[in-house]
Amino acid sequence: MKKLKYFTKRKTEFNGFLKNQDKLGESGKKIIIAAATAIFTISLTFSLAPRKTYVNPGISPSASYVVAHAGGALEVNGKSLNYLNSVEGFQKYYADGTRMFEYDLVFSKEGKLVATHKFEYFDGYSMKNPIPYETYTQTKIAGKFEGMTEDKLFEVIEENPDCKFIIDTKEKNETNVYERIVELAKEKEVDISKSILPFVTSKEMLENINKMYDFEEIMLTNYKKNYTTRELLHIIDSCDKIKYLHIFPVDFINIDINEINKKGIRVFAHMDKRNKARTALDYGCTGIFSDDISENEFKEKHYDFMVSKLETVKEIPLPRKQEKHSIEVELSF
């Protein structure tokens, strides 16, 4: 839809350009518009088709392929609820092999970090009217679940050194959120270099993150700036800590994923719907952000297809599933 809106806007601008050309007759305008539309249609048709195979960016047997979006969806009364950012989401998906988790952190009224996307489960609160920390901790998300707070996040980090946490935020100054995380890490004397995977939205943010802390890896995301392939490659070349690129489905035709793969960068696509996950793999991605697909489910149902889309597939053995008994989980829905 975003792609179609983009081309609609471009066509509107093109028509405006033609109206200002006094020397061009009405019939001439129609001919040029028809030709431009035909070229657009042909280019869009071809750009939508995925390649037969893509360069293997260098996935390994121990790699993770799923990021639990907002901590992962949970079921309540037979309905799957997303954007929970809950502790129980971490527990459930960890138990099913997932080792990469994305949480949305914002500041409470007192300046502490709490997890929420857009206050979906906290009536009366917003970015302009932050929730008090005590109110957040005393509120059960969807009436059942514990929200992730800054203190709980550090508990989870210390107890699960095999996990990576990707921190997104709707705060206008994203760097402030990471400054708070680094401040907490120093106070608690916790090494977050491997546990926190910065979710970088721009070149400016990348510079700030690199000055702030020596993170081992960084994930670049294209969902705010909509960079071109050339711009993305320039940013990637400027920082060897960038190991991942996060995109939305619109980027399947906006950027050349194969060129990103050639740099050894793994592309993770944001695929909310379970039945759409394979589309990302068809376009050369080697990871997904998902509300409800676990790591073990991915490896069971989608891994072989992903491998079939990558060159030198014989060098990529099927990874073993994570053991489900790694953590005990008690959930009541």
Which ranges hold each PLM region?
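Phosphate-group recognition and catalysis centered on beta-loop-alpha active-site segments
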Residues: 3-6, 10-333
